[in-house]
Each structure stands twice: as C-alpha cells, then as structure tokens.
From Swiss-Prot:
Gene3D superfamilies: alpha/beta hydrolase (3.40.50.1820). Its EC number is 3.1.1.-. Its main location: endoplasmic reticulum. Interacts with PKS10/PKS2 and 4CLL9/ACOS12. PANTHER family: TRANSMEMBRANE AND COILED-COIL DOMAIN-CONTAINING PROTEIN 4, TRANSMEMBRANE AND COILED-COIL DOMAIN-CONTAINING PROTEIN 4 TMCO4. Disruption phenotype: Male sterility due to delayed tapetum degradation and aborted pollen wall formation. Reduced amount of total monogalactosyldiacylglycerol (MGDG) and digalactosyldiacylglycerol (DGDG) in anthers. One of its GO terms (biological process) is pollen wall assembly. It is a multi-pass membrane protein. Involved in anther lipids biosynthesis and is required for tapetum degradation and pollen wall formation. Required for the formation of Ubisch bodies and microspores. Possesses lipase activity in vitro toward two synthetic substrates, p-nitrophenyl acetate (pNPA) and p-nitrophenyl butyrate (pNPB). The keyword Hydrolase applies. Residues 34-71, 154-185 are annotated as: Disordered. This is Transmembrane and coiled-coil domain-containing protein STS1.
Length: 661
C-alpha cells in the first residue's frame, strides 16, 4: 500500500480505529463526561446496553465472540465497518479477529496508549524520505485549512503557527469542567503529554484511515453477496464519529480532519475522472490497484501532485493564494515539482475553478438532494423541497447538514435562522408544508397580540400557567376558549410533520445525500420532523450509519410514549435536546401531551446518551428560536466530540467578563 506507515503502524492504525468505534458506541448510551468515576463500570454498562434486550452478562468478547449480543457491536463483522478497512490497510487477515476482540473487551481503553506509541515509532529505515512525504501531506492539509477559512480561530492559529504545520495543541478547545478530558474520553491511563508532537505523522495516520473508510473496496464473493443487502457504499456516520474521537485523542483540531476529507474526496474524484476519460474497461482488481496507487495517499499525493489536482473543484482564489504562499517551501522539499511548478499550478487553479464536479462525491451525482424529485408522497403532504444554503456546495465536502424550521411567518424563515451559522458542512434547508407552518405560526402570533393575551401577559400569568401545566392544575376557561382556533391548525401541522419525517427517512435511505454522514438540526415542528425520521429509520435494521448528529430545539415531542431509545440508536454521534422552561406557547399548543406525558421542548429528558441543554435565558417564547438558533448552535460546539455541560448563562457571563476586561 502506498503510504508512509509501516506494516506494524498500519496494524496499530486499524486497532485505533476499532477502539475508537467501540468507545463511540459506548458513548451512545453512556453520556460522555456524565460520570467521572467508576469508568470500568460505565464501559461495561455501555457494552451491554447497546444490545436490543439491554441485558446480558459481563463476559469478555474473547469468550463470547459468537454470541448474539456481540452482533450489536459496531466492531462486529456483521456491520462491515472494520474488516474492509483492515483489508485496505493490508493487515494480515489472521490478526483481524484479535483486533475486533481487543476493541470489544472492557479493557480496550488500556490499549490505546500502546498503539499510539507504535504509530509514532521511527524504524530508522528511510525515515528521512518518510518525513519529507509526511511533511508534504501536512502542508497540503494546512493549505486546505486556509481554504476552508470560515473560522476566525483558524486565522489566529495560522498567524501563530510554526513553519512545519498549524499547531494542534488546542484540538479540544475547552473541556467540560475542570477535570481532565482524558478521563472522559476513555484514555485515563494516558495523558496527551505522552503523545509525541509529530503533527506530520498524525496527518498521515488520519489520511490513511479516512481513505480506508471511504474507499470502494473489493471483497470476496461471499462478502459481496452479503454487502448487497447489508452494507452501503460511501462514508459511514459511525466511521466519522470514530475519526472525530481519534482526532481528539491525537489533539488534532477538527478543521484539519475536515481538510483531509476534502483532499480525499477530490483525490477520489480526480481518479474517477481520469478513469472515465481513459474509458478503460478495467477489471475490479486493476481498479483497486489504481485507487491504492494514485487515488489516495500515493506518492503523487504525498509529493504534491494530487494536491494540486484538488484545486479543480474548489473556490480557487483562496486555495490558489495558499499554494502560492507555500510554493517556495514545498518546492524546496519536493524538487520534482519545483517552486515555479507550484506557483504555475496555483495560478492555473484560479482559472479552472469548479471544473471538477466534486459535489458528486460518493454517489450524489451532482443533483443530490436539490436535483431529485420529491420523495414518494405520503398522505397529503404537498411541499417537501431541499434548498442549498451557504457556500460549501461543489466543494468536495464529505458531510451534509439538513436544517429544518418548524415555526415561520414567511418563507424566508425556513432559511433565515440558519444563515449566520458557520460550519463546513454542505448544508441544505428543508422547506416543507410552508402553508400550514405559516398558518399555525400566524395564528399563534395573532393570539399573542389579542387583548386577552396582552392582559394575561401584563398580569404575569403566562409563566404561572406553564407552572400550572407542569403541576397538572386546571386551565383558566378564558385561556382555553382563546386557543380553540389555534388547535385545529396545530393538529394539521403535527400530522404533516409526522409524514414529512417519514419522507425525510426515505430520502436518506435512498442515499440522495450522496452516501455521506448527515447532521440533522431543527426547531419547533422541524425538530419533530427529525424525530419522526429517526423513528422511521429505526423500523428497519442496519440504518445506524446514516445520521451523525442531531439537535432538537423546542421539540413538540412527548417525553413518554415515544421510542426515544430507538431514535437515539439511529444517531452515531451527539444527540442534543435543547429546551426552555419558559416556552409556554409550546405548552399551550401541545398541552394534552404536556399534562400526561411531558414535553421535550420544555424539560430535560432522561434518555441514556441524550444531552439536555437549557436555553431558558435565550428563549422566552417559541418564536425566539427564529432569532436565537445561531447563538444556541455556537454554544453547543457541535464540532467537539464531548457534550457541552457549561450552562448558557455561565457561558454568557464568561464572554461578558472577557469583553469587560
């Protein structure tokens, strides 16, 4: 395999991915950082709770490797997440089962340090050549980070960086609380100080692992038969979560991993375009050899050749400038290309921007969400349309964000709340049943401006009404009468949201997102659409790899009587429930559920693996989410692996204090 990693290091790389996969699955049901003691007990709980029955013993994987309980583990062969990676890394097949058992054992975290030390070992042979190649790759990552450039912190990092690579000492920007995040990440036997400050080797490791995760790998006939019904091509959300955790172990900022994703996507597209142009009728084996040789981390990529090809699918001015700035350094390190060659290619990149349709990454075929016709109509849903938002389209992004409003006064409100949020996802908004959403939102607004509502607000009755609801007190008759005309519109909107959720699930199952991990974020009825989508995905097996993260804001979803655990299992990474105890409008409109079953948008929910974030300080009414969504998302720090435990009020006080100084 064309990589700078030795066979032993490739073995360690596969082991680290396996360990990260297992730890990430544990964190689905044991909220990371929620317990600072009895880590081993937590890990064993995570091991058993992921099985469908929730029960089971504490026997190790080595003595129970064939049991049905182990089939639920992401590291099990039935999920197809590890063995294709092992094959790509050319790890001896005799070692595969041992790696899987090590990852599944309750002592897995104690192996992490040993495997990391192997990764950073130098064997003395050709170490100079390897260092040059790894440095070239790290430089390529730096260039890509600059082109992503929507993060002010990245700019500060570049200004303060050393000559070799952007510093990555703050990969976990801030830990949740004063305790070391090592304990919370399952590496309590290892401190980050034990990891060598070899940024170049870290980039080579992450590049190799990502390449292995997304490559279309040849398999045996038996595996091919099973893959056709069970495995999906593309980038599995569970792989991305595991790489996010591994990046945290390595203290690598996530934007660097995003840069590597773009590089791999563009390299793959360049290889595909070259293959298409040559019109070769190559055998699967020769295609595989070509992919390994040139499509990923081959010599061309590591010496800069393929890195230049990447510019074809990017917004060229920024990245061309980056190549121009780095040309002298890279030219010295890679005489084959030369400084003038880099400068010339950087200039050329500015004139051919967008010539490579990298939006077709892994099956999106250019059209993707926006180019597809509406999914099969369900019930009476008349409108269900994806619209691109932001500047990250046709940029080789390997992750997608779908943003869903559920409270709107005009069509712009389906887009406006999400415009200011800066992220490197390829983002889309879902505009659905706008007629009904606007109707119910307007009805609520009209009621708020009525004489009765104004009088009640003047008397401070609204918050006491909500308190009364939670205590199951009787409602004032005047208030009930005033909300009658809202109820019918709300009932219709609830019905449409449930059906839209099923349609969203169908879109994801069809792979219209390009077989890339999806982040789902929605507020109000949009949050309900997402929840119902997850429930629909949970009805059939093997759908755990589609959705990476979920954020529900002000969700009109009952706490009891809904399959929260099943929905949680469909999300590989973080699942956040954002609520406001002062959202009395949600309580009024969904009062029947609130009285008997609780309501996620108003209170914390006790579901293993779900983060609860109280935003009462920002949201004093349901419509507040329209203006507060961006600030809430920034507070959640979704690109960190661990949950955010700092209350919003405390975070604001800290910010105010910093400004005051």
């Amino acid at each position: 395999m064309a990589t700078t990693l030795t066979p032993t290091q490739r073995y360690a790389a596969g082991a680290l991915l396996a360990l990260a996969l297992r730890q990430a699955q544990i964190h689905q049901s044991v909220l990371l950082g929620a317990h600072h003691h009895h880590d081993d007990d937590d890990e064993e709980q995570g091991r058993t709770s992921t099985s469908s029955g929730g029960g089971g013993g504490s026997s190790s994987s080595s003595s129970n490797s064939g049991a049905g309980a182990d089939a639920d583990l992401w590291t099990h062969d039935s999920h197809g997440l590890l063995r294709p990676v092992f094959r790509f890394l050319e790890i001896d097949p005799k070692a595969w089962s041992g790696l899987e058992e090590t990852a599944a054992s309750s002592e897995a975290k104690h192996h992490i340090g040993a495997f990391l030390r192997i990764i950073f070992e130098e064997d003395g042979e050709s170490s100079s050549d390897r260092s040059v190649q790894e440095l070239a790759l790290a430089k390529g990552v730096d260039v890509m980070v600059m082109s992503l450039g929507n993060d002010s912190e990245v700019g500060n990092t570049i200004k303060g960086g050393d000559q070799d690579a952007l510093p990555s000492s703050s990969g976990t920007d801030k830990s949740p609380g004063e305790s070391s995040h090592d304990d919370q990440l399952g590496i309590n036997k290892l401190t980050l100080d034990d990891i060598p400050a070899n940024n170049h080797r870290k980039m080579a490791l992450l590049f190799a692992l990502l390449s292995a995760c997304v490559a279309d790998k040849p398999v045996s006939q038996e595996e091919e038969d099973r893959k056709s019904t069970r495995f999906r091509k593309g980038y599995d959300a569970r792989h991305r979560v595991a790489l996010r955790l591994l990046s945290t172990w390595l203290d690598v900022k996530w934007i660097k991993m995003e840069a590597i994703e773009v590089m791999v996507a563009c390299s793959a597209m360049a290889a595909a375009k070259e293959q298409e142009q040559s019109q070769e009728s190559a055998s699967p084996k020769s295609k595989w050899e070509k992919w390994k040789r040139g499509g990923i981390i081959g010599a061309a990529a590591l010496t800069g050749g393929a890195l230049l090809a990447i510019t074809g699918g990017l917004a060229a001015p920024a990245i061309a400038a980056g190549f121009g700035a780095l040309a002298p350094t890279l030219g010295t390190l890679v005489p084959v290309i030369g400084a003038s060659g880099f400068a010339a290619m950087a200039t050329a990149a500015g004139s051919v921007a967008g010539s490579v349709a990298v939006a077709a990454s892994f099956g999106a075929a250019g059209a993707g969400l926006t180019g597809s016709k509406m999914a099969r109509r369900i019930g009476s849903v008349k409108e269900f349309e994806f619209k691109p938002i932001g500047e990250n389209h046709n940029q080789g992004r390997l992750a997608v964000g779908i943003l869903i409003s559920g409270f709107a006064f005009d069509e712009d409100d389906f887009c406006r709340p999400w415009e200011g949020w800066q992220d490197n996802l390829e983002r889309y908004i879902l505009q659905w049943e706008s007629k009904h959403i606007i109707a119910v939102s307007t009805a609520i607004q009209d009621w708020l401006t009525s004489r009765l509502a104004m009088e009640l607000m003047k008397q401070g009755a609204m918050r006491t009404v909500l308190s009364g609801l939670l205590a199951a007190f009787a409602w004032p008759a005047t208030l009930l009468a005033a909300t009658d005309f809202i109820d019918s519109k709300w009932s219709v909107a609830i019905d449409r949201s449930d059906k839209a959720g099923k349609m969203l699930a169908e879109v994801l199952l069809k792979g219209l997102q390009g077989n890339r991990p999806v982040t789902l974020i929605g507020f109000s009825l949009g949050a309900r659409v997402i929840f119902k989508c997850l429930q629909e995905l949970a009805l059939s097996s093997d759908n755990e790899g589609l959705v990476e993260r979920v954020v529900l804001l002000g969700a009109p979803v009952s706490v009891k009587g809904e399959r929260w655990e099943a929905a949680r299992k469909m999300v590989a990474g973080r699942f956040v429930n954002v609520y406001s105890t002062d959202d009395w409008i949600l309580g009024v409109t969904f009062r029947a559920s609130l009285l008997t079953q609780g309501l996620a948008g108003i209170q914390a929910i006790d579901v293993p693996g779900v983060e609860n974030v109280d935003v009462t300080e920002l949201v004093d009414g349901h419509s507040s989410y329209l203006s507060a969504a961006q600030q809430i998302l920034e507070h959640l720090e979704l690109n960190t692996y661990y949950p955010v435990f700092v209350p919003l009020s405390a975070a604001n006080e800290e910010t105010d204090g910093t400004v005051a100084q």
